[in-house]
Amino acid sequence: RFTRFLKAVNAAGNGVEMNKFYLDQLSTHPDLTSPNVLDVLRELSEVATLAVVTNGFDRVQSRRVRESGILDFVEDVFVSEKMDSEKPNRKIFDAALRALGVENREHVLMVGDSLSSDVQGGVNAGLDTCWYNPNHAENPGKVVPTYEISSLEELYPLVMEPEELANVGLKNRRHQL
């Protein structure tokens, strides 16, 4: 892509080296975590199996996920490059659910910040979906999530039973940081 760009703007440079630099830099900026995400993941991982389904290059995404600190709380990470399919194609979700041993999709909630890939992908796979929309963006209405939240803490009542909600924040939980 950088070689084409350099040619299009009639500029000198090595597109292959630019692409390598871009991917290296991208993978060093996890930028996956919003405030409290690790706390929320810790709580949810006590009561549910969590996994990541992400589009991109395995080298980049695996490093980003690893450096974000979320690996302690997820069962697996499914990267589109390794899965030979990407969101919103249902095939990546089908493969991830198979790998996790999930048979009943009624017990699965796809949470994501992209209507076009995360939510549409979940819909395509027959899953309940939750659009994480912290900036209160307008939904153009083409993709309708099952739920919409603006803070990750809003996931607790969607995932947890009432008695589990009462334990949120207790220190005697399984995961400790």
Please annotate each region the language model reported.
Residues 16, 20-23, 44, 101, ...:
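Generic signal for short, ordered secondary-structure residues
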Residues 1-22:
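A metal-dependent, Asp-based hydrolase signature
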Residues 8-9, 47, 99:
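Alpha-helical structural context
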Residues 24-51:
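Short, acidic loop-to-helix structural element flanking the phosphoryl-transfer center
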Residues 5-9, 25-29, 80-81:
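Alpha-helix C-capping/helix-to-loop hinge sites
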Residues 38, 42, 51-177:
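Asp-based, Mg2+/Mn2+-dependent phosphohydrolase catalytic module
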